[in-house]
Amino acid sequence: MSESASKTPGSYSRVMLKISGEALMGDQGYGLHPPTVARIAQEVKSVHDMGIEICMVIGGGNIFRGLQGSAQGMERATADYMGMLATVMNALAMQAALEALKIHTRVISAIRMDEVAEPYIRRRAVRHLEKKRVCIFAAGTGNPYFTTDTAATLRANEMNCEAIFKGTKVDGVYDKDPNKFPDAKRYDDVTYDEVLQKHLGVMDASAIALARDNDLPIIVFSLDEPGGFRGILAGSGTYTRVHG
């Protein structure tokens, strides 16, 4: 077992926060909802104020989802590249919200676009974290056919994060959709293999396998719960821990 796998959330010092693009659109159904972006930025600030180093990956599904484009006849690689560009837009929006709160932030893109984001250079990104800057990794892995969940797991490993925090609309991993089934059971702990075998939908299989192979815990929690992110890192809160 790796050192990070044996730690509890209350002892983490560097984490990856993964959120979906849909989390930024509020109730409007599409695009960016500035008050929602600002609320999430405030949650990130509350953790940053604890001295914890923060990486972020944000999906792009509120603007464009590559798989949907592919299903409608678009070439998959082209659709995925469009989805990557959507993640850059979301990253810039989050950067603006964080810097409005006086949090130094860097957007780091896997696809070069030097006028708006830094290129991904691992050692430079680590140095940003050491200087307590929030690093938002955009454009996925830079390659089609990989999800932003896989990108978050990859970057979390490269940055030596102690866990991935997957912010969702529910407070953990359930055996079935709790919004549809009142008798749904929430797991406090679940293994990577159980997630894969039971199709629990935490992340895609590639991301789960990459986390499993590197003993990287995944903490699934509700991003809609005020103070939830900070609470878990302070040693309390409701969540599911995915581990080996």
Curated annotation (Swiss-Prot):
The keyword Transmembrane helix does not apply. Its EC number is 2.7.4.22. Keywords: Allosteric enzyme, ATP-binding, Cytoplasm, Kinase, Nucleotide-binding, Pyrimidine biosynthesis, Transferase. Gene3D superfamilies: Acetylglutamate kinase-like. Allosterically activated by GTP. Inhibited by UTP. GO terms for biological process: 'de novo' CTP biosynthetic process; UDP biosynthetic process. Pathway: Pyrimidine metabolism; CTP biosynthesis via de novo pathway; UDP from UMP (UMPK route): step 1/1. UMP binds at residues 60, 80, 141-148. Transmembrane segments: none annotated. Pfam families: AA_kinase. GO terms for molecular function: ATP binding; UMP kinase activity. GO terms for cellular component: cytoplasm. It is found in: Cytoplasm. Residues 26-31 are annotated as: Involved in allosteric activation by GTP. Its main location: cytoplasm. InterPro entries: AceGlu_kinase-like_sf (IPR036393), Asp/Glu/Uridylate_kinase (IPR001048), Uridylate_kinase (IPR011817), Uridylate_kinase_bac (IPR015963). ATP binds at residues 18-21, 61, 65, 168, 174, 177. HAMAP family: PyrH_B. Catalyzes the reversible phosphorylation of UMP to UDP. Homohexamer. Belongs to the UMP kinase family. This is Uridylate kinase. The gene is pyrH.
